[in-house]
Amino acid sequence: GGGSKASIYKYFGNKEGLFKAICDYRREQFYKDISLACMSEPEELRSYLIRILSNFLKHIIQPKNIAFIRLVLNQTQKDSTLALYIHENGAKMIQMTIAKVLAKAHEDGDLNCPHPNNSAMLYFGILRDYEWRIILGVDLVINEQEAINHIEYCVDRFLDGHQKP
């Protein structure tokens, strides 16, 4: 059966602990979904950067994920510790993963990217409009081809801006 509230809280500590555990689980699913970790060796940086954003967008526009994003926003308003935890283990962690990829490309001489953290922030800005639309619940019908065109165009501009002088 479905355990009692008391036994669930015994396991997770309290409501906050349970919510944190759910967030951790959802984050793991998210990382699997966007397969962030694995940049396959022969894969070009361009196709990797496009793939991550495409998978990211596909993930966040699913209705169950939209509902979860809104729930997280609601909960973090009331709990600054949770907000920090989610930021450190969510957005910041994803950004750091991309920053590492960019730093390596810089070291290998493939890109001119002396500030990979700033560049990673810029990179995720490519989806900012979509994220806000999802949060606000406006204009949620997203044309997949237009989204792909947008991502490819922006990644190309991003890479152009990181070419060696």
Identify the role of each PLM range.
Residues 1-17, 21:
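Helix-turn-helix
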Residues 14, 78-80:
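Short loop-to-helix capping motifs
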Residues 20-52, 60, 64, 103:
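Amphipathic alpha-helical linker/stalk segments
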Residues 47, 58, 67, 71-73, ...:
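Amphipathic alpha-helical packing segments from all-alpha helical-bundle domains
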Residues 47-74, 78, 124, 128-131, ...:
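Helical hydrophobic small-molecule/effector-binding pocket
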Residues 51, 55, 96, 100-107, ...:
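C-terminal peripheral helix-coil segments that are non-catalytic and often amphipathic
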Residues 112, 116-120:
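Membrane-interface starts of transmembrane alpha-helices
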